[in-house]
Regions:
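Glycine-rich hexapeptide-repeat left-handed beta-helix
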Residues: 1, 5-7, 29-53, 58-64, ...
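Short metal-binding segments enriched for Cys and/or His
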Residues: 90
Length: 185
């Protein structure tokens, strides 16, 4: 099967992992050619610090997770996230729990993704963005500087536009829009 058990995780033999700079939970699946702990892709800052990965995450083939840019920062991936193939999580990103990143998603540095968000195929998120909880981003969307992705809404396009409330996800999770608005305060 080409997978091996290591530190309570299932890791493909072709995965490249910087164990020295990684703190990882259990029951994660790390697929073929995944790179965790590559240098931060920043022209003026040195890679330093740690990557923190919780429990029960799936990293499909060719994903990249980069080191943070200083010891005071971290690249963080919570619990039960599903990261599809060829996704890039750049330096200093913070991903909460139950997030889905579809194939070929690219997160610039310092992106914060709140719980339950779903990003469609080939979504590109510019650095320093916040993606609200239980938001859904349509495939091929480009999120540039200074755009607030509000919790609980569906967004799509180039440039990105708010389409409507993500009612289905909110009903499934029994979450009111008012509760999500309070997250922004």
């Amino acid at each position: 099967m080409n997978y091996q058990k290591k530190k309570g995780n299932l890791i493909h033999k072709t995965a490249v992992i910087n164990w020295r700079n990684l703190k990882i939970g259990i029951n994660n699946k790390i697929g073929p050619y995944v790179v965790i702990g590559g240098e931060a892709q920043h022209p003026r800052k040195k890679s330093d610090g740690k990557i923190y990965i919780g429990d029960n995450n799936v990293f499909n083939e060719y994903c990249n997770v980069h080191l943070p840019t200083s010891r005071k920062k971290k690249t963080f991936i919570g619990n039960s996230n599903y990261i599809m193939n060829s996704t890039t999580i750049d330096h200093d990103c913070y991903i909460e729990d139950n997030v889905i990143l579809s194939s070929n998603v690219v997160l610039g540095g310092n992106v914060y993704i709140m719980k339950g968000a779903q990003l469609g195929i080939r979504t590109i998120v510019h650095q320093n963005q916040v993606i609200g909880s239980y938001s859904m981003i349509g495939m091929g969307t480009l999120i540039t500087k200074k755009k607030m992705i509000e919790p609980g809404y569906i967004f799509y396009g180039k440039p990105v536009k708010k389409i409507k409330s993500n009612n289905i996800a909110l009903k499934r999770k029994k979450i009111s829009e008012q509760k999500l608005k309070n997250e922004l305060i």
